[in-house]
Structures are given as C-alpha cells and as structure tokens.
C-alpha cells in the first residue's frame, strides 16, 4: 500500500493517510490502526483515517479511532479527511466533498475561510440491554 499522510486537528488529533488503493478493512485496518494509533510519535494516541480519492470530490474512507478501534463512521474523521484533501490539493475548497464510510456517506465542505461544515444522516446502528449488578461497598466505606 502506497500512502502519504497529513496530520489534522479538528478538536481531536487525526492522522489522514491517502492511498491509491481501496482503504484497508478488517484485520488489515486493525493492524495498521493499532500500529499508527499508538505510535510513539503520538503520545496521547491518534485517530487514523485511510482515504482513497475516487473522484475530484469523493473519497472512500475507513476509520480507526484511538479509543474504540474500527468504526462505521466518524464525523470529526470525515472533516479531517476533507480538510487534508483540500490542503493537499486533492479536492477543491468550497465544494461539497462526499466522504464514503462503511456506515454511510457524509458531505463535508471546507469553506474559503477554513470553516468546515458537515452534513449527514444520523441512524441507530445497534441496540442492546446492559445489566448492572449492585456491588457491596468495601468494609469501612459508607
């Protein structure tokens, strides 16, 4: 895989890696994500996005979040990818950029004043039940 990286901070740190091949998924994403997300160059950890330009305003992206691993989508990650694409000349400033993630497509616009706008659907992807067992306080604790 041939990659070039860009560091971007959009409230949290992101390492955006551009590739000519489809972005990694599954075990390959996990291997790259763990290695880069916890690299000594990033002492607090970093979110990692792999992005393949698929059109002048389209990017296929997979995400490895530093706190949770592979995710279906990431709003700040989509913004970081679009910003990096604009800053490196891969996508035009001021135009809607479609960021295709495993969980759906988000539209990001990096405006001329560097404001970044994100538009996309919010959808429930999981549901479940959590059973919390009461615990006894240790002796001497009230």
Spell out what each predicted region is.
Residues 4-72, 82-142:
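Active-site proximal loop and beta-alpha junction motif in alpha/beta enzyme cores
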């Amino acid at each position: 895989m041939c990659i070039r990286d860009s560091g971007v901070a959009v409230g949290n740190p992101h390492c955006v890696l551009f590739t000519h091949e489809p972005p990694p998924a599954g075990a390959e994403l996990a291997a790259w994500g763990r290695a880069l997300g916890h690299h000594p160059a990033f002492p607090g950890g970093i979110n990692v996005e792999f992005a393949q330009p698929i059109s002048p305003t389209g990017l296929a992206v997979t995400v490895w979040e530093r706190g949770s691993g592979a995710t279906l989508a990431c709003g700040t990650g989509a913004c970081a990818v679009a910003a990096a694409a604009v800053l490196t000349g891969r996508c035009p400033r001021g135009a809607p950029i479609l960021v295709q993630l495993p969980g759906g497509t988000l539209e990001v616009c990096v405006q001329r004043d560097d404001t970044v706008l994100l538009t996309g659907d919010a959808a429930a992807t999981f549901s479940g039940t959590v059973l919390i067992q009461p615990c006894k306080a240790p002796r001497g604790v009230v």
